[in-house]
């Protein structure tokens, strides 16, 4: 990579460079040159650096036809591990993946708060708790930085819903803003000093975050002393002078909308001073300097990594993220149902059994090196002859992608041929052989979801162009097949020359492609097994459509198309078949849940329910096989009306490349579960604290639950949820004793000199090695508090691995200010009030809780990190 001065470059070098930059060059540096790269100035040795999504894998520069990558478990899965060392190692892996993709800046982690269960991007973030989120983010960032890559904390702040995300104003009290939504950023910056922070799309109390001086200038840079770069979310800049003056350094992506000539005009009219401009330029140059540590060449080619040690780490992460929610006894053996016996035949049922639900949708999605389904993971462990499968029902929102099941006409390779044209198709239809157009590009592809945001070709200018998708489909069995076509643009699907889906003539707005696309339009056709059926799609990019976009969404240019298909299923018959098999089976695993179809950037879920047919399937199987193990995959809470009937229940999230192996490892005891819920699972949607005020209404969303987010609400109101925050069982048993709490410097005038040292003795009282997570909560003074406070709040945690019979002391150090303070709106600062607090150490299992008193001798006010 070209470099400013990668060896010993200091502040004076940057000062010198700024003095040599022309005004036009300074302005150019403050925006991207394309979707993923910053502006270069070769004459001064300033290179372009590359950014990449994030947060659970490094995609590289291409949504469209990209290079495969390693996919980590989703954010909530990582939060469930409560393992900072593991997350640090995964950060190191992400850095290596970034370098393989030629990237210097990773756009992750996401550390927004799941104030409710429906947020489309809820799966990306670690937890509903700000301390767990902030400490996990610090470990993530430290690991990424250890590999020389710059991590990016996102999204500052209150980007907690997708509905009207670029237009909505989050109305939040100063106290809730500080104690819940900003605290993860504060802790991550304190613990890791990441090189970049990304602003959110939304407004905060009436002002967009990317032009909000209170957030960027006063809190981030002023109070916290943050010295890194502040970059916009993609197309999340809304002004010229306001954003620059507030402290937004880099507008992304390019070409610019609000810098360039507009910023030059703001400079000449004194809307922006050159001093302020130089401050923004300095931060961009410092980002480039920091990025040079990666040793990645400028505009480096993208390549695969996929190392054996990475696959092992991903498998470990997948297994250690699985939460054991229930493990009751088998009535016939009087032993816990799990782990299962690999010598017995296992019946695997359900919509997620043969589906690789490895990641959520949107900017967190990527093309994985490989994926493992639960069925495959179980078969690989037990032997294929020991595993029987029954579908039960489908769980997809959109029909499964068809691309990998197609074959090219020319060579018979898996996939299809994608041809790009600058001219529209003939009126008679290009599939009839009357197409005289010459394609400007021809690609062989397997992924039939094609998002064209970053597709480019020298012969194409602008966003208007056309494409065809062509291949053959040979069905494994005869029957009626459903096909679905989703577009941000226009599309027609032909099977054997017959129009099966028209998504052009009349279109319906949907949530696809970040909210700018259509619903999936479907059609049916009877197909014969063993026959090659011709599949052809005519597509026009987004400008060819007259569809009106939803208000408050981000438009990503040319749009895209998605082609899906599968055999039509009679759900009642499929459930009946599954039930008949379950009644005779030795042991049964039912795999249900969501996928990236249901949880994605661009839209929120309308409800917490699992897909249609799922509840009926689970109830029917449990009626004949009460010992069936239920495995749920989702990134955020779902309703489980059958949970009281289920004796064995796992929450398995989106587990990345190794999702299926991680599930199988826990099911059969190769991994002893140690994960805990990082989110509260309510019994139903109306029980959650944000129920009455989640969506945008006339451009604003009221955070009416205030500081009582997640478990803070349930604990304070005494409402029992379905599963509590921090719940998670093990195949081992543990015992906590001898809790001690010691305060250092109890009378220090500066509370930052004071801390708590919480120590507890932990014993493994079982015959199986296992890991225990010790959660430390602090209860505020019951009578002496000057404001209402939650019953208890998480302030620290530690994970410890113990052999059978082993005993160890676990010590956790917590800053006293973090442990005892609330945000005092009267003095605009943190206040630690004197009084009698109680410290709780909580382990696995009912009643495994210890309590010790803590007396804070003096009240103290503080600010900053």
From Swiss-Prot:
Show where the PA14 domain sits.
411-579
Task: Report keywords, A-Z.
Answer: Carbohydrate metabolism, Cellulose degradation, Glycoprotein, Glycosidase, Hydrolase, Polysaccharide degradation, Secreted
Domain of life here? Eukaryota
Q: Disulfide pairs?
A: none
The question of whether Glycoprotein is a record keyword is answered with yes
Instruction: Return the EC number.
Output: 3.2.1.21
- A Pfam family that the UniProt record links to this protein: Glyco_hydro_3_C
Q: Which residues cross the membrane?
A: none
Q: Which residues are glycosylated?
A: 330, 447, 503, 764
Look up the record and name the pathway of this protein. Glycan metabolism; cellulose degradation
| GO cellular component labels | extracellular region
InterPro entries per the record?
Cellulose_deg_GH3 (IPR050288), Fn3-like (IPR026891), Glyco_hydro_3_C (IPR002772), Glyco_hydro_3_C_sf (IPR036881), Glyco_hydro_3_N (IPR001764), Glyco_hydro_3_N_sf (IPR036962), Glycoside_hydrolase_SF (IPR017853), Ig-like_fold (IPR013783)
Q: Does the keyword tRNA-binding apply?
A: no
Any one GO MF annotation of this record: beta-glucosidase activity
Q: Give the residues annotated as active site.
A: 233
GO biological process entries:
cellulose catabolic process
Q: Identify its protein family.
A: Belongs to the glycosyl hydrolase 3 family.
Q: What is this protein called?
A: Probable beta-glucosidase J
The protein's organism comes out as Aspergillus fumigatus (strain CBS 144.89 / FGSC A1163 / CEA10) (Neosartorya fumigata)
Please spell out the taxonomic lineage of the organism that makes this protein: Eukaryota, Fungi, Dikarya, Ascomycota, Pezizomycotina
